[in-house]
Amino acid sequence: MNTEATHDQNEAQTTGVRLRNAREQLGLSQQAVAERLCLKVSTVRDIEEDKAPSDLASTFLRGYIRSYARLVHVPEEELLPGLEKQAPLRAAKVAPMQSFSLGKRRKKRDGWLMSFTWLVLFVVVGLTGAWWWQNHKAQQEEITTMADQSTAELNADKDSGQNVPLDTRDATSQDTTPAQTAPAPATPVDSTAATQTPAATATATQNTVVAPSQANVDTAATSAAPAATETPSALPTSQAGVAAPAADPNALVMNFTADCWLEVTDATGKKLFSGMQRKDGNLNLTGQAPYKLKIGAPAAVQIQYQGKPVDLSRFIRTNQVARLTLNAEPTPAQ
């Protein structure tokens, strides 16, 4: 009867009461139990008062109670029913991993943004390349067209230039015929001079064939042959005056370091030159300023105007057809 009464009494006592009674029987204080179990005094007090701290997990609380029971020699099996009531096991709540899905969604968005950026970059590069190619092709077509036009003009100039010596030769023969058929004077000195006149006439005729532009000068010299018979020293003087003309201050001098097409027009609209110049070639032009120039390859030509070099660097940098006008500078009065 006493055993059953003791068992019923133990069941009536809670876990905290039984642990406190066992501690008091052993003469231990709460401080001593806390030091041996490495717990806080407040935790030991909560266990004896059957309190479950809110900041303490049930798993840890059950472990502390078992350690306390072993310390005060209380069987753990007797405390199990009370443990289920005092510290029931609670299922742990698992929070959804929102950060992972958020990071994945953000990474996907960044991938789309990067793809769009690369697409825009490729489009810009493609448009730039197409624009450059169109400009380059247009320049090449323009140069080809100008070269074809200059070739046609050169052929026309050659055809007209071949007819000039024939007309000049006829005019020269007409002018020299009276000089050859003129009656010879009676004096021996005059006959000697008349004998030299046909030779000078023949020489003038040969010069007109070689240089058509001097036909008028040679014709005038031939028509003046009777006057030369009277004063033989006058002929060399007049020839020297024709051979050494005065230098034109508006002369245009060009030296070519590579093949280059160009067109030069003076103020009257006359084309002084239009065509292709080869490497190491030189070109001296004289006309009425200002000059208008079109140069296919500015880097291949060096220009001097009025003794000063012409700056073509702005055309060389852009690698375009040079179009410029050279204005005449006033010369100082002498």
Swiss-Prot record:
Top-level taxon of origin: Bacteria
Region (Disordered): 155-207, 221-241
DNA-binding region: 30-49
Ranges of Low complexity composition bias in the record: 176-207
Regions that span the bilayer: 112-132
Stretches in topological domain Periplasmic: 133-334
Alphabetical UniProt keywords: Cell inner membrane, Cell membrane, Cell shape, DNA-binding, Membrane, Signal-anchor, Transmembrane, Transmembrane helix
Chief site of localization: membrane
Domain HTH cro/C1-type, first and last residues per copy: 19-71
Entry domain remark: The helix-turn-helix (HTH) motif in the cytoplasmic domain of the N-terminus is involved in the formation of spirals to maintain the rigid rod shape. As this protein is anchored in the cytoplasmic membrane, the HTH motif may contribute to protein-protein interactions to form the RodZ helix, which is localized beneath the cytoplasmic membrane. The C-terminal domain may be critical for determination of the rod shape by probably interacting with enzymes required for synthesis of the peptidoglycan layer, including PBPs in the periplasm.
Alphabetized PANTHER family for the sequence: CYTOSKELETON PROTEIN RODZ (PTHR34475:SF1), PTHR34475
Name of protein: Cytoskeleton protein RodZ
Upper lineage: Bacteria, Pseudomonadati, Pseudomonadota, Gammaproteobacteria, Enterobacterales
